[in-house]
């Protein structure tokens, strides 16, 4: 399991004062993966990927990707990463600390009707509209956004970048080949994608083809991650978010089978 927003709310008071030393940076492998067991490693921040913070503290709880959108202020994450009535902020390319000017407030949450109705893991994705007091858009500051694609076919090589649950630190990354789990969920064999990496985008070039979430909130075993299969639902969700209408109230209950 990759820690739902509902569970994290109860941890905020306990962990907000905890610190973490950032491990040395590496870079995602430049060659296709082999049969050798893969493990995520620290990577340099990507300005198109950032950390989500729930509550007023410094604890980052999930990951999100900056989207290429009409207004430039939309991000994509897992639906189980958001909870109703909880202030949420986002920092693109987060590393160790954040300048106040780089902190974006979540202004609206857009959810698939299947998630709102029953927390269907096939619809475990959310688009968030963000705002801040400065000039320019989030997408401009990130140097561009990621486009939403379709679910990867088995054997597709993808990169995943995410932030483990904690205070400070930086991202980890992995490059691996996707597989297909029962129920139609894309899966990604790679160790070290721990709690907090929910919402981490699975990318092929500038295209997001999945995100850590879906089956069992992204997986009960950190050696295998899952994604909700990107379908017409995520495309429709982007269109609704770009239209700028009112968002949805995120459910306050989420459970998995872990």
Each language-model region and where it sits:
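Catalytic histidine site
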Residues: 42-95, 177-182, 213-214, 258
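Catalytic nucleophile loop of clan PA
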Residues: 192-222
């Amino acid at each position: 399991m990759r820690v739902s927003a509902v569970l994290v709310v109860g941890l905020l008071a306990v962990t907000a004062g905890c610190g973490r030393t950032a491990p040395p940076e590496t870079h995602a492998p430049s060659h296709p993966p082999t049969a050798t067991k893969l493990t995520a490693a620290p990577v340099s921040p990507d300005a198109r990927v950032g950390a989500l913070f729930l509550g007023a503290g410094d604890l980052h709880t999930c990951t999100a990707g900056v989207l290429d959108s009409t207004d430039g202020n939309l991000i994509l994450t897992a639906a189980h990463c958001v909870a109703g009535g909880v202030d949420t902020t986002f920092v693109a390319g987060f590393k160790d600390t954040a300048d106040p000017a780089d902190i974006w407030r979540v202004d609206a949450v857009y959810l698939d009707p299947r998630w709102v109705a029953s927390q269907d893991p096939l619809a475990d994705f959310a688009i968030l509209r963000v705002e801040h007091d400065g000039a320019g858009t989030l997408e401009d500051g990130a140097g561009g956004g990621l486009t939403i694609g379709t679910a990867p076919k088995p054997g597709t090589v993808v990169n995943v970048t995410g932030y483990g649950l904690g205070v400070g630190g930086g991202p980890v990354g992995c490059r691996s080949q996707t597989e297909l789990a029962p129920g139609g969920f894309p899966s990604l064999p790679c160790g070290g994608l721990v709690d907090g990496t929910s919402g981490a985008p699975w990318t092929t070039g500038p295209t997001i083809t999945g995100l850590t979430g879906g089956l069992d909130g992204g997986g009960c075993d950190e050696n295998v991650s899952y994604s909700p299969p990107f379908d017409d639902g995520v495309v429709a969700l982007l269109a609704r978010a770009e239209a700028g209408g009112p968002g949805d109230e995120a459910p306050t209950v989420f459970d998995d089978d872990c």
